[in-house]
Amino acid sequence: QNANQAAEKIHRAIVASTPGEKRLRVALVPYDPLGDAHGVNFDTRRDTWPTRADKSAVSHVALDSDWEAKFAQTLESLDAVRAYVKNDKLGFKIPYVFEGLPRSYYPDYLIRFDDGRPDLLNLVVEISGEPKEQKEAKVDTATKLWVPAVNAEGRFGRWAFVEITDPWDAETTLAETLGRFKTA
């Protein structure tokens, strides 16, 4: 188990140390490579937050926590957010390995972000609480493997990943992320 974890960390470090090389490839779902939020329709017993029709193709955010409610409110208020959706029943997942086993990571939100460039920035967002080893593997895979692979593919626009550790400060974190890409 420890050997598998060490090998996974070494692999992510090697890939991260060779930026710009198009070695990573995206694994697409053959029958639905692009995905779509317009067909999302499900019942829930969870609390919900209504979304603005001009911001989200899904009418409500099904809430898993107060943190996600606060984050949805923040997204609704930001002009730079052109569209967003909570990744609930969308099927958007990032494959990763933890303790030697293949797993699927379902990030919390997907955002189309206007960073001042002609093409919108697609932002994968994780709302995180306390640090956990499995979460570290998910975040590492998303930032060091998945984002570089999808950006190298070139057909799906620009992508980035951000982890929100304090939803009450999410606007600042998103502004910092936006600033990074305005200068890139």
Segments the model singles out, each with a brief description of its role:
Residues Q1-Y106, R112-L121, I127-A184:
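Intrinsically disordered, low-complexity, repeat-rich regions
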